[in-house]
């Protein structure tokens, strides 16, 4: 389930105690973490980063942890869940998957999947037909889907057949490496309640409309229209038919979301919470202040600038957990920007920009050591079998003088503290490059999310270093949902492409961290980067087993810089959990930022 926006999951699990004045009313501090509760757990979210899409076939900007891990996947479980199982963090999480492990045959062109016995909340069995329903809707509306890459899923499926209620057979257009296909393609399958959703209007009776292209389009458009009516989420009967551990009780556009256990959940364990509540905070500082004041939150996030207060939290009875999250951070640069697209298409400019990121300094002072450098497309922590020595070596270390030399060698008049200008237009080895006219200035506009103080420090440092090299970086701030909304595939000259760069916090990678969906042509949300060589190398990681092809891809992307690498804040290191929260192991040890509240309970 690798995704451009499944990255910075700045939610914290926060468990509320029942105070007589309300869920978040002030409670007196007793020197221990809040221990009384009424079975209500609160997940803290950031205003502007809350769930705003309930339909599991999501567009690119809607692929966020707030929509998926913290919302949709609690109600609509993926068929196969990869990653996050304690002790087997990079494998199939069999306990919460709705099917057994896929079986490959016929030279890895045929996949057979056996469904487990799960039921929808209305008592109807979850069957292979619910999977083909999802596939039919997706195939007919694939250009809407945020995970779609031409030639990949669903294009690489020749047929998908419900052999019987419990057996799904998928025939592929060619052989694929099973590890890649299972973790990056099959993990996208989400059974949908065909018996309740296969209709074209609120008054129509469910049928088999999805089995024709036009019918699938009509059903999809109806469901999408209902999903766009966010004010009706809790009252619309469509969204009450779920197979996950929770169902929706109430929803507000401000970000207040209440979920309650699905009493018909077929998986194990059964939810023991009375209610799961999501409440937005204006900032991490506001959340942390509430935590320190013991106002009802018994778990939360420690902002990077407040890590010195961890001993005080421990004295209050909290436990700190420190599992690294498996991701990397970056500035998305827009190769089709009317202002900067031709600049970004020059490797030497991308190299110069990367040399202006002082990652060791940002890790130490911006995040107080609570971050990992990003040097390429594979996370450096936790350790995995996919990281090469080349990427670990930091190919572009911080050096303002190296950045200046690169620009000078390619036809730029470098003006430290001023603004560099192109004085040698053209395509020769000493020229500025194609599309860059004489007099063009190195001026970039970058939008970023200031949710964590560390982000602002990091971006200010980058701006200052760029200024030293004569590059004008103009920074502006925006909320997470606002930023991700502007980063889709676009054409140069279109209004949708009128942005230079954004930084929203990075991405959590999947268990097999290939570049599909990130660095191949037409990848959603990643700045319109396109390289035939990258496409070939990414395809090789999909078709060929083993790691040698993967290492070639990784080294190429680390060298080519389709984005500007930035430090990845380790959100797992700065979390605290009250001692009376049970069943938190899967969340605590999960490097992929998943949430498993069906395991939670309260105890002494």
Give the label of every model feature segment.
Residues 100-145, 163, 169-171, 287-293, ...:
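Aromatic- and charge-enriched surface segment that lines or borders ligand/interaction sites
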Residues 44-106, 136, 241:
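N-terminal lobe/hinge region of extracytoplasmic solute-binding protein
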Residues 104, 109, 351, 363, ...:
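Extracytoplasmic/peripheral linker and loop segments enriched in polar/acidic and small residues
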Residues 246, 340, 373-429, 449-457, ...:
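Structural transition elements
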Residues 150-223:
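Surface-exposed binding/hinge segments that line
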Residues 55, 343-384, 394-410, 458, ...:
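Periplasmic-binding protein-like
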Residues 252-255, 385, 393, 413-505:
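Ligand/substrate-recognition segments at binding pockets and active sites
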Residues 138-148, 159-162, 249-264, 277-341, ...:
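Extracellular/periplasmic solute-recognition and catalytic clefts
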């Amino acid at each position: 389930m690798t995704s451009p926006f499944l990255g910075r999951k700045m939610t914290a699990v926060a468990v509320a105690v029942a105070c007589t004045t309300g869920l978040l009313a002030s409670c007196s501090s007793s020197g221990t973490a809040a221990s009384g509760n009424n079975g209500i757990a609160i997940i803290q979210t950031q205003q502007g980063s809350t769930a705003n899409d309930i339909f599991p076939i999501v567009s690119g900007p809607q692929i966020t942890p707030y929509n998926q891990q913290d919302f949709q996947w609690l109600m609509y479980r993926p068929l196969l869940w990869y990653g996050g199982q304690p002790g087997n963090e990079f494998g199939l999480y069999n306990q919460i998957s709705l099917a057994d492990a896929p079986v490959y045959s016929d030279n890895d062109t045929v996949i057979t999947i056996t469904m487990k016995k799960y039921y929808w909340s209305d008592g109807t069995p979850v069957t292979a037909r619910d999977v083909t329903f999802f596939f039919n809707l997706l195939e007919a509306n694939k250009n809407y889907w945020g995970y779609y890459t031409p030639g990949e899923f669903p294009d690489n499926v020749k047929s998908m057949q419900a052999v019987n209620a419990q057996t799904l057979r998928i025939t592929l257009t060619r052989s694929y490496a099973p590890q890649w296909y299972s973790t990056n393609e099959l993990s996208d399958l989400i059974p949908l309640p065909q018996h309740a959703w296969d209709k074209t209007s609120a008054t129509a009776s469910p049928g088999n409309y999805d089995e024709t292209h036009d019918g699938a389009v009509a059903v999809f458009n109806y469901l999408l229209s209902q999903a766009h009516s966010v004010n009706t989420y809790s009252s619309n009967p469509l969204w009450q038919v779920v197979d996950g551990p929770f169902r929706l009780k109430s929803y507000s556009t401000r970000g207040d979301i209440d979920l309650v256990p699905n009493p018909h959940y077929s998986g194990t364990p059964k939810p023991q919470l009375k209610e799961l509540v999501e409440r937005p905070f204006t900032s991490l500082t506001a959340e942390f202040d509430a935590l320190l004041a013991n106002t009802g939150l018994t778990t939360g996030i420690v902002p990077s600038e407040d890590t010195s207060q961890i001993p005080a939290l421990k004295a209050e009875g909290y436990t700190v957990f420190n599992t690294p999250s498996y991701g990397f951070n970056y500035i998305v640069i827009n190769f089709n920007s009317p202002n900067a697209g031709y600049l970004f298409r020059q490797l030497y400019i991308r190299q110069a920009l990367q040399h202006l990121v002082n990652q060791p300094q940002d890790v130490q002072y911006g995040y107080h050591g609570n971050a990992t450098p990003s040097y390429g497309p594979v996370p450096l922590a936790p350790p995995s079998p996919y990281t090469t020595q080349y990427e670990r070596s930091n190919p572009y270390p911080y050096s303002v003088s190296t950045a200046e030399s690169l620009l000078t060698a390619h036809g730029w008049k470098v003006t430290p503290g001023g603004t560099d200008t192109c004085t040698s237009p053209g395509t020769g080895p000493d020229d500025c490059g194609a599309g860059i006219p004489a007099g063009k200035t190195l001026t970039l506009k970058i939008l970023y999310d200031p949710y964590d103080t560390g982000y602002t420090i990091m971006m200010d440092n980058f701006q200052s270093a760029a200024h030293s090299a004569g590059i004008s970086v103009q920074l502006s701030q925006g909320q997470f949902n606002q930023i991700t909304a502007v980063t889709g595939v676009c054409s140069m000259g279109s209004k949708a492409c009128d942005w230079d760069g954004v930084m929203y916090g990075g991405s959590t990678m999947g268990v097999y961290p290939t570049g599909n969906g990130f660095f191949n042509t037409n990848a959603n949300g990643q700045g319109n980067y396109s390289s035939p060589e990258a496409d070939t190398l990414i395809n090789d990681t999909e078709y060929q087993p083993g790691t040698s092809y993967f290492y070639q891809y990784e080294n190429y992307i680390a060298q080519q810089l389709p984005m500007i690498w930035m430090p990845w804040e380790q959100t797992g290191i700065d979390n605290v959990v009250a001692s009376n929260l049970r069943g938190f192991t899967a969340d605590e040890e999960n490097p992929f930022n998943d949430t498993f509240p069906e395991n939670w309970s309260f105890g002494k």
